[in-house]
């Protein structure tokens, strides 16, 4: 059985940076926590907890020590509280996420209504909205929602960093019919685009696709959706234990990709498991 492993599988720059900062901070500070999970990988979060980094869900529950700002960023209101309490900050926000925050803020300051392409309940999206400080922001997940947008004199478009370029492009096309003036900032992470394009190519060749990563990871879920559109025999797994032998009946070529927050050791376990089945 042939195995095609995506070159782009695993940690992206932002996740690698965030985890390195977190492990270094664990050595530096006696009392340290992260506001929400640093990345969307339960396995990595568990390893960080073993190093003494507790995940705290509410900023109000942090009254001393150091706090790590997760890779997805936090809200402006949460950051205000952290500053007010004079907590030490380890900022692990992905630079691409910060760029999306800055563009959304700039657009609102210049009088644009912002169309944010993304998932309304995702922490990254909630963070981006908050930095506009009450500006008009419409969160749209797909073309259907974009069709319902009201007309506005000026529209500015930004995207959650893990969105597909195709989705951004289609929504932008609809927005062109909603306003006389439209500004578009492609805030999709470069690594996301590379990963998605590579997944498409592999899915065209493979008889079965395995997409490895946290079930709570937006970019991994999107990878699975992209692969599923091309290769219906696509399975999203978080760990090697979830792989079932019955999936591989009649399969000659297996494609494997992984989300941006999937550690290498989990990918290696999946590759080893599939290799063992072909012996």
UniProtKB/Swiss-Prot annotation:
Which residues take part in binding isopentenyl diphosphate? Answer: 40, 72, 122, 217, 219, 261
Pathway per its UniProt entry is: Isoprenoid biosynthesis; dimethylallyl diphosphate biosynthesis; dimethylallyl diphosphate from (2E)-4-hydroxy-3-methylbutenyl diphosphate: step 1/1; Isoprenoid biosynthesis; isopentenyl diphosphate biosynthesis via DXP pathway; isopentenyl diphosphate from 1-deoxy-D-xylulose 5-phosphate: step 6/6
Q: What Gene3D superfamilies does its record include?
A: 3.40.50.11270, 4-hydroxy-3-methylbut-2-enyl diphosphate reductase, catalytic domain (3.40.1010.20)
Q: What class of enzyme is it?
A: oxidoreductase
Entry keywords, A to Z: 4Fe-4S, Iron, Iron-sulfur, Isoprene biosynthesis, Metal-binding, Oxidoreductase
Q: Does the record carry Ligase as a key word?
A: no
* GO MF, one example: 4 iron, 4 sulfur cluster binding
Cofactor(s) required, per the database record: [4Fe-4S] cluster
The catalytic activity, as recorded, is: isopentenyl diphosphate + 2 oxidized [2Fe-2S]-[ferredoxin] + H2O = (2E)-4-hydroxy-3-methylbut-2-enyl diphosphate + 2 reduced [2Fe-2S]-[ferredoxin] + 2 H(+); dimethylallyl diphosphate + 2 oxidized [2Fe-2S]-[ferredoxin] + H2O = (2E)-4-hydroxy-3-methylbut-2-enyl diphosphate + 2 reduced [2Fe-2S]-[ferredoxin] + 2 H(+)
List the EC numbers from the record.
Answer: 1.17.7.4
| Residues given in the record as dimethylallyl diphosphate binding sites | 40, 72, 122, 217, 219, 261
Cystine connections:
none
CDD domains annotated for this entry?
lytB_ispH
Annotated [4Fe-4S] cluster binding sites: 12, 94, 189
What the record notes about the co-factor is: Binds 1 [4Fe-4S] cluster per subunit.
Task: Quote the record's binding site residues for (2E)-4-hydroxy-3-methylbut-2-enyl diphosphate.
Answer: 40, 72, 122, 161, 217, 219, 261
Residues of the active site are 124
**What InterPro entries does this protein's entry cite?**
LytB/IspH
Name the GO terms of the biological process aspect. Answer: dimethylallyl diphosphate biosynthetic process; isopentenyl diphosphate biosynthetic process, methylerythritol 4-phosphate pathway; terpenoid biosynthetic process
Pfam families with a match to the protein in the record: LYTB
Q: Known PANTHER family for this protein?
A: 4-HYDROXY-3-METHYLBUT-2-ENYL DIPHOSPHATE REDUCTASE (PTHR30426:SF0)
Q: Which NCBIfam families match?
A: ispH_lytB, PRK01045.1-1
Biological function:
Catalyzes the conversion of 1-hydroxy-2-methyl-2-(E)-butenyl 4-diphosphate (HMBPP) into a mixture of isopentenyl diphosphate (IPP) and dimethylallyl diphosphate (DMAPP). Acts in the terminal step of the DOXP/MEP pathway for isoprenoid precursor biosynthesis.
Which family is annotated?
A: Belongs to the IspH family.
Record-linked HAMAP family: IspH (MF_00191)
Name of this protein: 4-hydroxy-3-methylbut-2-enyl diphosphate reductase
Q: Record the organism.
A: Syntrophotalea carbinolica (strain DSM 2380 / NBRC 103641 / GraBd1) (Pelobacter carbinolicus)
**Encoding gene (name):** ispH
């Amino acid at each position: 059985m042939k195995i095609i492993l995506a070159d782009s599988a695993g940690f992206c720059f932002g996740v690698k940076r965030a985890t390195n900062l977190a492990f270094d901070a664990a050595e530096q500070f006696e009392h340290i926590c992260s506001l929400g999970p640093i990345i969307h990988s339960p396995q990595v979060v568990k390893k960080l907890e073993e190093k003494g980094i507790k995940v705290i869900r509410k900023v109000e529950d942090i009254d001393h020590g150091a706090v790590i700002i997760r890779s997805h960023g936090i809200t402006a209101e949460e950051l205000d509280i952290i500053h007010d309490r004079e907590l030490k900050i380890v900022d692990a926000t992905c630079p691409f996420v910060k760029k999306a925050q800055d563009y959304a803020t700039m657009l609102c300051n210049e009088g644009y209504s912002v169309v944010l392409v993304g998932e309304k309940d995702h922490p990254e999206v909630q963070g981006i909205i908050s930095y506009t400080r009450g500006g008009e922001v419409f969160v749209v997940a797909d073309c259907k929602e974009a069709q319902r947008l009201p007309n506005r004199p000026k529209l500015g478009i930004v995207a959650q960093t893990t969105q597909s370029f195709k989705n951004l492009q289609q929504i932008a096309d609809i927005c062109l019919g909603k306003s006389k003036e439209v500004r578009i900032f492609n805030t999709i992470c470069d690594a996301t685009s590379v990963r998605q394009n590579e997944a498409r190519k592999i899915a065209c060749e493979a008889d079965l696709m395995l997409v490895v990563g946290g079930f709570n990871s937006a970019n991994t879920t999107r990878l699975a959706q992209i692969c599923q559109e091309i290769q219906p025999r696509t399975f999203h797994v978080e760990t090697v234990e979830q792989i079932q032998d019955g999936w591989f009946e009649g399969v000659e070529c297996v494609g494997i990709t992984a989300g941006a927050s999937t550690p290498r050791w989990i990918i290696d376990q999946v590759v080893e498991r599939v290799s063992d089945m072909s012996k």
